[in-house]
Amino acid sequence: MYKEPFQPTYEYALECDKHDELKDFQTEFYKKEGTIYLDGNSLGLLSKRAEKSLLTLLDSWKEYGIDGWTEGEHPWFFLSEKLGELTAPLIGALPEETIVTGSTTTNIHQVIATFYEPKGIRTKILADELTFPSDIYALQSQIRLKGLDPDEHLVRVKSRDGRTLSEDDIIQAMTDDIALILLPSVLYRSGQILDMKRLTAEAHKRGIHIGFDLCHSIGSIPHHFKEWDVDFAIWCNYKYLNAGPGGVAGLYVNKKHFNRPPGLSGWFSSRKDKQFDMEHTLTAADHAGAYQIGTPHVLSTAPLIGSLEIFKDAGIERLREKSLHITRYMLNLIDHELKDFGFTIGNPFEDEKRGGHIYLEHAEAARICKALKANGVIPDFRAPNGVRLAPVALYNTYEEVWQSVMILKKIMKDEEYKQFENKREVVA
């Protein structure tokens, strides 16, 4: 259990660390000495187990050559399905409904090509104006491929405050001309969690298929897809799941849709026992593997093997418990220490609406992020004025949170940020 109630002292942070049930996992990760890493919502840290599984698959290539597809500790031919099974508990899905494959954007193209069937008056896709740009680019592309105009057929729900979305507004936008819905589970800037259960139920009442982009929720919050009856989902594995830069992504398709042919077919859509028959008629797999396209990217998949072992040991419910407590602690500390320095807290305070990161707004956000980095704290800048800070349950400590807020306070008090330009780097 975590120490209550909140106190702004250094001693309180140490007490919270002492009572942290997940503290033993911190030694699993490579943490640079003298650095406080608060960017795990953008790229998670390397774990020793992920490193080991990557080296194991490199060794299997070295030892087996082509036979690595079927030999060794982790045969490559079955790896996507195996890791899909291990991922399924994180989203509350059946093992056969989950596959590890492709990238987030290619998987968006796959699910939209599979589920978007404009007919009659139902020709539009419903999204939102705060979602990640790649989702919008893919949706626009898929609409054009149907010979339609994205300006007319892509509906984006407006935000009332520029940070969050109202579920009531989303439901109101589920009109008779909507053919498909794709929404984020957690908004990438503000960290707001959308009520996926409610939105799915409302979409289904209207006969609309609905899916979610889980990039900022998987590995951070529990999901219950079997209960919620979500139609499809996609995600990356390199944020909270620590699969490494450019690591393989994931895809979920509700089993009730397994009779739906993949919109984008490829060799690895095949049933495994038929794949090497080399027929020109596809015999699709009878599970989520049917929605793979090409050959698995084995080496970018390898770190996920070790990472998912850690998640199995830690448990997503325990991770969420700590995440809620440490983000609430950070919010309280920011409110206590930084209220005179022009920051606006942009993420929800309510536990049920708050994802795994803190979102601060400030007119000098870009240069503040640079000053934090110069002081050994790794944040994340999001244009135009956002600072994201992610105290990750697996490897961040309460002491690090306390130290980072005190460093930020000193930066603001001494105006250290003014020595930097207030514009983002090429990679923010």
Curated annotation (Swiss-Prot):
Entry-linked InterPro entries: Kynureninase, PyrdxlP-dep_Trfase, PyrdxlP-dep_Trfase_major, PyrdxlP-dep_Trfase_small
Cofactors demanded by this protein: pyridoxal 5'-phosphate
GO CC terms, sorted: cytoplasm
Entries under Pfam families matching the protein: KYNU_C
Modified residues (N6-(pyridoxal phosphate)lysine): 239
GO aspect biological process, one term: quinolinate biosynthetic process
Record's keyword annotation contains Cell cycle: no
Pathway note: Amino-acid degradation; L-kynurenine degradation; L-alanine and anthranilate from L-kynurenine: step 1/1; Cofactor biosynthesis; NAD(+) biosynthesis; quinolinate from L-kynurenine: step 2/3
Catalytic activity: L-kynurenine + H2O = anthranilate + L-alanine + H(+); 3-hydroxy-L-kynurenine + H2O = 3-hydroxyanthranilate + L-alanine + H(+)
EC code: 3.7.1.3
Binding site for pyridoxal 5'-phosphate: 104-105, 132-135, 213, 216, 238, 267, 295
GO molecular function term, any single one: kynureninase activity
UniProt KW keywords: Hydrolase, Pyridine nucleotide biosynthesis, Pyridoxal phosphate
Quaternary structure, from the entry: Homodimer.
Role summary: Catalyzes the cleavage of L-kynurenine (L-Kyn) and L-3-hydroxykynurenine (L-3OHKyn) into anthranilic acid (AA) and 3-hydroxyanthranilic acid (3-OHAA), respectively.
Family classification: Belongs to the kynureninase family.
Name of the protein described by the UniProt record: Kynureninase
Organism: Bacillus cereus (strain ZK / E33L)
Lineage: Bacteria, Bacillati, Bacillota, Bacilli, Bacillales
